[in-house]
A protein has these predicted regions:
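Periplasmic/extracellular, small/polar-rich flexible segments of pilin-like filament-forming proteins
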Residues: 57-146
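N-terminal alpha-helical signal peptides/signal-anchor transmembrane segments
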Residues: 42-63
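N-terminal single-pass transmembrane signal-anchor helix
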Residues: 1-41, 45, 49
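Intrinsically disordered, low-complexity regions enriched in small/polar residues
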Residues: 5, 32-35, 51, 83, ...
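Generic hydrophobic alpha-helical segments
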Residues: 29, 37, 53-56, 114
Length: 146
């Protein structure tokens, strides 16, 4: 008796088709999670800048003296997903890299009647899903149009 060994062409083609279908579903989902992780990295990068601006306002009395590189506010550093961070008069501006399709986050502090700072901001990107993710993670009430 002759026994066949191996796979038939049809079996191999079905396997390739199944892998292609799974890849077409999985890769976009993976890219979405990568972008969300990048926005989360952006959020984490703002913490020392926000804290420094708040301390600067406490010591100096107003936001106009709170600039990057002075009054304890760190100079702008880039990270894996952030192209640049600037602080001018207490306004923190972050510009994302190509992973974030040009996401720009502008965070503005305003003093309330108790002398505390309230942070508001706008996320602007060519990709609306990144803007929405930014709005959600940062807790902003406004999303800029890309």
């Amino acid at each position: 008796m002759n026994y066949r060994h191996g796979f038939t062409l049809i079996e191999l083609m079905v396997t390739v088709a199944i892998i292609a279908i799974l890849s077409s579903i999985g890769i976009p989902s993976y890219q979405k999670y990568i972008k969300k992780a990048a926005v989360t990295d952006m959020l984490q990068a703002t913490v020392p800048y926000k804290m420094a601006v708040e301390l600067c306002v406490l010591e100096q009395g107003d936001l106009t003296k709170c600039n990057a590189g002075s009054q304890g506010v760190p100079t702008g550093e880039s990270t894996r997903y952030i192209k640049s961070i600037t602080v001018v008069k207490g306004v923190i501006t972050l510009v994302g890299d190509k992973t974030l399709t040009g996401l720009t986050v502008v965070m503005t502090a305003t003093k309330n009647s108790n002398g505390r700072l309230n942070w508001n901001g706008v996320c602007t990107s060519a990709d609306l899903s990144i803007s929405e993710s930014c709005k959600s993670l940062f807790g902003f009430t406004d999303v800029g149009d890309g």
